[in-house]
Amino acid sequence: MTDTSDARPPHSDAKTASNSESENPAIDSPEPKSHAPLTNRDWWPEQVDVSVLHKQNEKGNPFGEDFDYAAEFAKLDVDAFKADVIDLIRTSQDWWPADYGNYAGLFVRMSWHAAGTYRIFDGRGGAGQGSQRFAPLNSWPDNANLDKARRLLWPIKQKYGNKISWADLIAYAGNAALEQSGFKTAGFAFGREDIWEPEEMLWGQEDTWLGTDKRYGGSNDDKRELAEPFGATTMGLIYVNPEGPEGKPDPLAAAHDIRETFGRMAMNDEETAALIVGGHTLGKTHGAADVNVGPEPEGAPMEQQGLGWKCPFGTGNGNDTVTSGLEVIWTGTNSQWSNAFLENLYGNEWELTKSPAGAWQFEAKNAEATIPDPFGGPPRKPTMLVTDVAMREDPIYGQITRRWLDHPEEMDAAFAKAWFKLMHRDMGPVSRYLGPWVPAEQEIWQDPVPAVDHALIDESDIAALKSQVLQSGLSVPQLVKTAWASAASFRGTDKRGGANGARLRLEPQRNWEANEPAELDKVLPVLEKIQQDFNSTATGGKKVSLADVIVLAGSAAVEKAAKDGGYEITVHFAPGRTDATQESTDVESFAVLEPRTDGFRNFFRPGDKNPLEQQLVERAYLLDLTAPELTALIGGLRALGANHGGSKHGVFTDKPGVLSNDFFLNLLDMRTEWKPSELSENVFDGKDRATGETKWTATANDLVFGSNSVLRALAEVYAQDDNQGKFVEDFVAAWVKVMNNDRFDLKQ
């Protein structure tokens, strides 16, 4: 396991996407098949793809939507499970022999590469869903031979069945590997539920493995900028090229790439150094020969049954294994925790050499062969990756690792925390954690919120608070926008954001442009006073949080708007949110949640060149919405006048603030002709076909519900005369879903 460690099987001509001999060895990249268009996406690639909102459909889940993983996990004998995993790690199998008779290094690499796909910009990736089982991750060059690691785990999964998910098992295997080596981890939380098809994720625009040109805009200089939201420098790698940028063995240049990519996984310099040093304390890389390995699992012949990268050299395993093409053994205590990585790194001078497979790596200069062979052969000289030497040569990393050389206990503490963060970064709040090994203390990166320590409000309190809100002088749009701003920061990918904690009143969210800080300055003090007045007079130990008041106020506004439209409804409300503090809020970490656009509020920035309708669907994906829910919410929010800045774009009604289906009625009215605005970018004018008078204005966030055939079909449903009530019901249901997205306590 490494920043890429066992990354890239070699092929016969040793060429990569950039056609550079210096990146030898490289995988024989599968090429896109040329064919006539076969799908709608082939014919109309610019059309927004709404199908992404229906991934992970329960129809593909063999357990159905009622399966309760937490209940199944509660039946697990965790001590027996742990003992079985450790026994597996220490028992070499003939079909894939373990280095030094121990699979610790292999399992650490598997767990790291499962978790290491996480990226901060959209919260995608990570170990939380067992995605490594599926393409493309199961066939990435960086994940070569991890198919064997997962296959080794199958007897454990088979034995414990539904009580342990693949996602938890893959993540825990690395934790167990560290513990059985003598390392004391910071704990472990179960609770990852499996998905049953690949996660919807753009890994890059390159069409060859190991390509870099698109994410860097064709630049290869030292100041090149990695495009967002990507977290890796190279297509098919977890982080960086272990031989250095573009295969050029420059440790300082490698350090630059390491810092950027690990930062995009939410790791600082100390955490990054700890992960590399700790992760390379166990295991080795494999590059026994310059041979052409077979195709990856997705391209392998059927008879290989999901195993790929078949190696024709010697036995194809053991000392004849070819994985990355790098042949590096970091320590002589390969299966035991030690400080030997740093002792070797600083106890030797390093000279550049090549592995038997032709990959750039470093070997200890004038050193004796002191590293035991994993299968009893002649001892080896100490070796390091280019990215390992970066931990010494880079001034910042060097200062950190030199300190750890003399104080290994500090390194152990740093690695324990960094490893726990790596394994759990995409799991969301601790309320989702399961098992007996969850640390008692929360870290700030977990976005902690206080536990409920008081009696909750009841139905009569809720009714009284709603009445106070509606008599406060705040308008329906103000209340709806505030509740939406609080809840819509949620990301279903890494379970961050949401209304719980009321972080809308804290930095950085208080001053996000999308949240209209000037409006918040008017609304929040009023809601805070309502909260304070209630808490000062309530009896029976009852209290209400501002987080609850914000959501309750928005729901009260929706009820009023529906009533004004002729529909008596009750918006379901579940109290139990609490208020976070500024001290428990990592401003820098939360900054990546700031919406650059939000089509639900018709918020966008001038000059934005990314299609608004695609960004709207992406926002809906992060909110875990279906296409019907997206459609109902847009129609309702426009009717309620909840646009950013009070803009009239898409407000196709003469009674804003009333919950009606007017948005759909007027969008589909053929008496209106739409044309791009001559005055405003990203704006369209809706003109009366008879008079030429401008009736409405809109953005792509609005017109996509008339232009996209799937969304238009849904819009037509809500425009029907017999579906006005259905629209109100569907809008309210979708509204409640968004308000409760982060209420994991309600889902247990």
UniProtKB/Swiss-Prot annotation:
Disulfide bonds: none annotated. Residues 1-40 are annotated as: Disordered. There is a cross-link at residues 239-265 (Tryptophyl-tyrosyl-methioninium (Tyr-Met) (with W-112)). CDD domains: catalase_peroxidase_2. Its EC number is 1.11.1.21. The record marks 109 as: Transition state stabilizer. Homodimer or homotetramer. Bifunctional enzyme with both catalase and broad-spectrum peroxidase activity. This is Catalase-peroxidase. The lineage of its organism: Bacteria, Bacillati, Actinomycetota, Actinomycetes, Mycobacteriales. The gene is katG.
